[in-house]
């Protein structure tokens, strides 16, 4: 019901009648002594109490899956981790991190899913992932977290690319001066994209304000197209460090763009496995 905000759709998913769904909600409201949903016109809206109950339910579901797997492995020497990472982290940060962890914990069996932030959070909610490393935004009310690192987020172009506003005078060029360029951007749901959208929103701009928009869900393809002069992009410095060092990609100097963003280690808020996840994170982060 929380997901659909509609009794009929919830009943169809659960294969029960709509009155049965309504009755279950009434029983819950009576038990907790508060409204879980209210009507605003023709819309059903989740109350704050309803949101808290939904969050607690998702945490319980996550812990149930994790506990079931843990129980199945009682007596086994092998440790099994199900972790996720966003594409930037998965391709440019995670490999060395995992290598260090595997050397320290050779008994561990690691299962890694690389996807965008919204998909990873959904997999955590479903109990299919223990935790994830993400750069996108997430609800602090629903997830516990620790900061892994703080990374520069920069505008980039190919080595020989010239913007319509020029590229050499950082005292003059502003973000809005790039709107005449083609923009290569990640797909919706990507943390890398959401960071840019929020930055632009703070400047009363949008990705749709650029002359042309190319949506690409692969960072390597984006970097290749940038190198070939097909437009500009905004990526984490960690994702283009090699190309910057080689000179095939360069940072666009902007007067009004000096952005850093955190990479986060996240798990369900209130999880009974929170202490264990923190210990694993400590091992993953340790570079010695």
Per-region residue spans from a language model:
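Flexible hinge/capping segments at coil-to-helix
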Residues: 143-188
